């Protein structure tokens, strides 16, 4: 009952808390005071009076709006009381008051709780923080309530909120209202059920009872619900407010954006905050505003001990753990001080406020700030000027680090749990906040910096290098820096603003990929961050250096870094897009955590390992990981770090060049990406590079290639970026990691991932990018040698974007091989892979089909037979037998067949067709066995194309394997199964129709399928288009078109387009045409 009640109530309440309360709870139709209050709270309409009160509160107390609103709610609109509560704190945190002073159906707690409304509020606030801190878990505490709680969450309200609604309802203190009411057993039950329990640990305990009560007192609960329902709504509303940053990190980020970076929030209004918040806040504000000395003073104010060495204090207070913060050492400078102030302010505030805010929220904010700070730091470093202001803050890294990185470092100290996450984010949050508040520019720059950050393994050193001067200068004149910042902010703002939001946004509403990343941020990030942690500074520092780079990026002055950053710099980052995703990683700082895996930013240094971890965590590819590491470094190297780093992979490629170029590419790409959002476009740029790098790529990447590829890829990856598949990213990243990890993954992915992400992305991209992508991709895939890996991992990805992917991959294989006919090329490709002989036997292929039937790949008779078969049902049967053979043969013979299968292109068509290919019963028969493969094929078909080998496994475990390569052949591959199946029939058909297509009706022609197709192709294609002969064309069209496009892309890329296109098109179209006449009459008719 509990459940049902809870559920209904939860749902109903959430959906229409008041109505339900009143309507469903007929027991108490009239609105209770609490319900009314809830309704008011829930009400969306703006209450001028209330707003006025809130403004008054804000002005008087200097607290942020959320706090004031909450306090007002808690105080039932009593401004004076709210002021006292805000300024003095609710002493009554532990008592509750029932708004309606409802009769205590839940008499248990009602009386006592009622008395201490304030206490309840306090509790609620505290609990709210707790809930934020604890988030769901506490809420989970109540079993039944969960439904409600979850609902609350769904609503964007916290479960707690839900709870609140029931009990707390009105009170912002979720607990308070809910509690007051909830106090009663029913309330408790409800409370629990709704997640009120979340707020109070005590409630927790009670909740169990409450839950029971909830169940037992369903009636009560309902009544209460009736009463409380509004609470639910209200609580939800309120909670939502409360929970914003709390429940989701994403939300936190948004909060940060909001400025509510809890601590940071003050930044925008430092003065107010200063006034409001602990000295720290003031300090922060002052610091931001003031000169270093001021900052120092502030710092002193904040932390006398800190004042002396702000940097340390900064570090110290902020991080609790000076060491890392130190990374900011360059940052240590004055601005470091400032940072320290900021950091401290953040840290303390964060901690203090964070406590109230919620560890998670706080952390989140911090992370964001930290990431931002890092960005800023990087940014500042890179452009001292730019970051100056935030340099200070940015010193960021320090600040961010300081703020949170320090904290991060401190993480061990204070937020160790959070730290990991915080590692980047804190900055980012803060930064974000700052950025948002302070300097969108920063945000932008910030965004960019992070990627750079990663590049800079040098960490602080690097950053500091850049930074130091900057830092010093900045520290000398923080204000000027700020001004700069502001200017920058304005400057960047324009572009950045969006990015800033985007960057932050991703935190909250990243794409799933981003979210994942973000999540990774959380889970992955922990490990990563961990590494991060180790290198938090690094990361931060990295950021810093990169930051410089970043800025540099623009100038790329730090080439080394620059590249790195550049790619990142992608200011892209800046913008954002990356931000978005990639903001790239730039944004990534935060993003990095968030999504970023990627890399590239990876922080390289930072991240190599983190990335690695990340990768591991995400990808699970160990090798990749390793690679990744390498790569990462490579990336670093490639990226810019390369320079340093890791040359490893890349050293060979001149990381710098590459880096630069890559970076440039990347950057460009990134920019593209950002601009494009794109991605694909960016990819194009890299395209060339990519291609050439593909091989390299495969080398792994070679950093170079990776980089370059990556550049291109990166873009795409970025684009999809990472495609979401973080893992992919990672993995590919590892491949490319270098390049960008991100990208790399996609491309090579890679293969897999790429395919996945990229694939789809690419696919998207592919369209535009496809060529590039394809080639890159395929190169990558091949090069990567990840084909096989792709296969397994990639395959699925491939499947998703088989066509797109396939083309890319496909062309990857065949492009060079066969420029003439797609078909031949594909065939060749396949055969080459599997059968060199078949390759030459385009003719044979037909025969091959027959051969398949006969198990004789090259059998003129068979071929003839095949034709006959096509017409006669018997052949179908034969086919059926061969089918098995063919399945097996497929690999072998059929491979040949497959090669010819290109023609089977129709078959392929048929394959897709095959479903609808009525005329091809044989095909159908044939198909079924193959079909299973076929489906894979068809899914894979792109894949196959893309990853022949890998496709192979997918397509046919046995037969398709060959096919796999054949896949290149294209769709055919996928067709292959069907084609194979219908191979005989089809072969015949093919021949027949080929003849028809050829119009010469020569079997040879069919053998010369490419020629025939080629010749006929052009015509046929038209025909094909024209001939939508029923299913054939029909399916053909879909498959074929994609194939054609893909193939064509491939071909085009390969430069085989003309011939290839024709061939393929012709083969497929012809087939349809032929099918129509020959095939249809033959196979379909016969069959």
Curated annotation (Swiss-Prot):
This is Ubiquitin-associated protein 2-like. The keyword Nucleus applies. The modification N-acetylmethionine is found at residue 1. One of its GO terms (biological process) is positive regulation of stress granule assembly. GO terms for cellular component: chromosome; cytoplasm; cytoplasmic stress granule; nucleus; PcG protein complex. Keywords: Acetylation, Chromosome, Cytoplasm, Disease variant, Intellectual disability, Methylation, Nucleus, Phosphoprotein. It comes from Homo sapiens. The modification Phosphothreonine is found at residue 425. The modification Phosphoserine is found at residues 356, 360, 410, 416, 439, 454, 467, 470-471, 477, 604-605, 608-609, 852, 859. Residues 213-226, 377-389, 474-485, 534-569, 688-784, 873-896, 1053-1067 have a biased composition (Low complexity). Ubiquitous. The gene is UBAP2L. Residues 133-145 have a biased composition (Basic residues). Gene3D superfamilies: DNA helicase RuvA subunit, C-terminal domain. PANTHER family: UBIQUITIN ASSOCIATED PROTEIN 2-LIKE/LINGERER, UBIQUITIN-ASSOCIATED PROTEIN 2-LIKE. CDD domains: UBA_UBP2_like. It is found in: Nucleus; Chromosome; Cytoplasm; Cytoplasm, Stress granule. Residues 49-89 form the UBA domain.
